[in-house]
Design a protein with these regions (language model features):
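RecA-like P-loop NTPase motor core of helicase/translocase proteins
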Residues: 1-180
């Protein structure tokens, strides 16, 4: 029987806090962007909602001690828009795969508010690749069951490998997880 460990609960609680802060700050940034479109002569800057969420967590003491003094590191997309990112640092044997599937579920539900999308799952070596692929394809395994819940059904999850064909229609209608 699978049992989530206390420190995994703490890691996921921190992720939940970050996603909540992102939602709040993104809502505000979206409202500013809408107003700026209606009033272009005001030249309003659009807030970086990701940095604001990070700073909120820092001010609340919710960042890990190892990250609290490190400056915010901005990530942007090709259109110069802020992009949130998450790194979960967990020791060997610490349940990183479980945290990853639980994290995907939370990100899909709490932040993206979608049951469909694309996840690129990168593993460090062939042994972990083989093991992870086996678990993600096994509908009886807790990892796969967490993904099934995130996608609102087992028939809505596609576990893919790099040689598999990726189609936009699949990404729009399924949770596509490509393992590399």
């Amino acid at each position: 029987m699978f049992r989530q460990l206390d420190y995994q609960d703490r890691v996921l609680d921190s992720l939940d806090a970050y996603l909540d802060a992102l939602n709040e700050k993104k809502g505000r940034a979206d409202r500013v962007a809408e107003f700026a479109l209606r009033e272009p002569d005001l030249a309003l800057p659009i807030p970086d909602f990701v940095e604001e969420a990070w700073e909120d967590l820092r001010n609340q003491g919710r960042l890990p001690v190892s990250r609290a003094t490190i400056p915010f590191s901005r990530r942007i997309d090709g259109c110069d828009r802020p992009v949130p990112d998450v790194v979960l640092k967990v020791p060997t044997g610490g349940g990183k795969t479980w945290l990853a599937v639980a994290g995907v579920s939370r990100i899909m539900g709490q932040y993206l508010r979608s049951n469909a999308g694309f996840v690129l799952w990168i593993v460090p070596n062939e042994a972990i690749y083989t093991q992870t692929l086996k678990h993600l394809k096994d509908r009886q395994h807790p990892y796969r069951q967490a993904l099934d819940r995130a996608a609102a059904g087992a028939d809505r999850v596609l576990i893919m490998e790099k040689a598999d064909r990726l189609d936009a229609r699949d990404v729009e209608s399924h949770l596509c997880v490509m393992l590399l």
